[in-house]
């Protein structure tokens, strides 16, 4: 059995879930660690497809269903209010320092 939660709910340990424009995808905020767990909506350097060396980039638009990159940026903007140090991604290298700066760049 799994417990259901909604984006915005506070989970054990103060963890928060943030909705994204990608259907079924959330970003988790771990406040004690000042870490975002971004799943598939953000990609780190070297991630396929593309394999660019940008520290952080948006997932390919085709992964978003009917949403666009603009929709994704808008859904992620509330994360800019957080004191992010690290961004963990499912694809590519994580951001282990200056996470907020990397997030600001990708959402600009």
What is the predicted function of each stretch?
Residues 108:
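Basic, nucleic-acid-binding surfaces and adjacent catalytic neighborhoods in DNA/RNA-processing proteins
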Residues 1-11:
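Active-site HxH/HxHxD metal-binding segment of metal-dependent hydrolases
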Residues 16, 20-105:
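Metallo-beta-lactamase
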């Amino acid at each position: 059995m799994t417990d259901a939660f909604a984006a915005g709910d506070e989970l054990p340990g103060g963890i928060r879930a943030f909705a994204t424009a990608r259907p079924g995808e959330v970003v988790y905020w771990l406040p004690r660690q000042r870490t975002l767990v971004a799943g598939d909506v953000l990609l780190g350097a070297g991630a396929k497809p593309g394999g660019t060396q940008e520290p952080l980039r948006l997932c390919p638009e085709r992964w978003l269903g009917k949403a666009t990159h603009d929709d994704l940026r808008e859904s992620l903007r509330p994360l800019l209010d957080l004191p992010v140090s690290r961004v963990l991604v499912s694809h590519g290298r994580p951001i282990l320092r200056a996470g907020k700066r990397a997030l600001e760049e990708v959402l600009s």
